[in-house]
Regions:
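Hydrophobic alpha-helical membrane context
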Residues: 14-15, 254
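Sec-dependent N-terminal signal peptides
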Residues: 4-13
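Short, conserved sequence motifs used for protein processing/export or organelle targeting and
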Residues: 180-181, 186, 190-369
């Protein structure tokens, strides 16, 4: 309770300190800076093509995504109101979800539409205070350091919990109301070798990875789902077990789907779709949206949605009618992801083929005895 009271007093009595850009962290936190540079958090409106195009379709005046995608903007109110636009010459705009922002969150306020990160105000004329989870953190000549209980359980909830639009339609949902950030940190920020600082004064020997591992990491994306195959006469059952603390599908632009093929002597004799993966309704996982009963791709103003999903830490069995199997027949089941589902091309230009190209998450093969 004393710690929480201390942080509230900070908010009431201090004003903003000078912004420390991402690169300034490199001097002491070289390894963490290197990890961060490869993460999604390092990307901004200017380097994330998909995000930029979607944001511009929603509005070419207001940058309503700034709250989470440009949180340290020194003119964030003007960006949200449409009085200003993202500026490539402004470091607080190009730093993405910056180191300084993530380490100056005082607390997270729960709200219906989206949770709110409240930034700590800093003592004017003094070096800034940065927060984290480490016990007895070290100060430096650039900043003071304080262990903040928010970073143990709540820090991810500000941006990664949920988003509901003005029509009370869910845009995305990764966490339920009872969840905290512990499982997020354990999976996406595992402990890796090396201290948090280059000097490692306290010989900690480990630090939380700042790669923020996710769908872009080939090895990491194999770990979230188990695929089990069983065959009964002319019935193929595929059980998907979601081991993650969030649903299989979170982002509205993304699609994940099953590609299933049965082969006999190297010839495909059955598959779950012919041309497009969404032909298999049960094996295609994505959000779809309507606005006043008309299909829309971008959900900013949607009035309803439908989602086929596998909920957090749950299983789903998909059943298919297939030909009778013979000895030696193989069943190949692959779970794929499209970072931008094909429908996105209806409303934005997707020159980056990697966004729509299906990428394998996990594959299993069953051979009939």
């Amino acid at each position: 309770m004393k710690q929480l009271l201390f942080f509230f007093l900070l908010l009431l009595s201090f004003s903003h300190a000078k912004y420390m850009d991402n690169h300034s962290c490199n001097e002491c936190h070289e390894k963490i800076y290197e990890e961060f540079q490869s993460s999604a958090h390092s990307h901004s409106y200017f380097t994330n093509t998909l995000h930029q195009q979607i944001a511009d379709v929603v509005s070419k005046e207001k940058y309503s995504c700034a709250t989470c995608h440009m949180p340290m903007a020194d003119n964030i109110d003007e960006l949200l109101s449409g009085e200003a636009r993202p500026n490539k010459s402004n470091k607080t705009h190009t730093d993405g979800v910056s180191c300084f922002f993530c380490h100056t969150i005082a607390y997270v306020k729960r709200a219906h539409k989206f949770n709110i990160n409240t930034k700590a105000k800093q003592a004017k004329g003094y070096k800034p205070t940065l927060y984290g989870r480490l016990a007895k953190p070290d100060d430096s000549d650039k900043h003071s350091s304080v262990s903040n209980p928010v970073y143990a359980k709540k820090v991810c909830m500000g941006c990664h919990s949920h988003k509901i639009n003005d029509n009370n339609t869910t845009v995305f949902r990764a966490m339920d109301k009872k969840q905290d950030s512990v499982s997020c940190i354990n999976c996406h920020m595992p402990e890796v070798s090396g201290g948090a600082e280059k000097m490692d004064k306290r010989a900690r020997g480990q630090h939380a990875s700042h790669k923020f591992l996710g769908i872009h990491d080939v090895e990491f994306r194999k770990t979230g789902m188990d695929i089990n195959i069983t065959v009964e006469d002319k019935k193929l059952n595929v059980m998907l077990k979601n081991k993650m603390a969030h649903p299989l599908i979170v982002q509205p632009a993304r699609a994940k789907f099953l590609k299933i093929e049965i082969s006999r002597t190297e010839k495909v004799i059955w598959k779950n779709y012919e041309k497009e993966p969404n032909e298999d309704k049960q094996g295609y996982f994505a959000y779809s949206y309507t606005q006043d009963k008309k299909e829309v791709i971008i959900p900013a103003h949607a009035t309803a949605n439908i989602v086929n999903n596998v909920e957090a830490e749950s299983s789903k069995v998909l059943s298919y009618d297939t030909p009778s199997l013979q000895k030696g027949d193989s069943i190949r089941v692959g779970l794929y992801v499209q970072l931008a589902k094909s429908d996105c091309a209806k409303v934005i230009e997707l020159d980056d083929s990697d966004l729509t190209k299906p990428q394998l998450m996990k594959e299993v093969v069953f051979i009939q005895d």
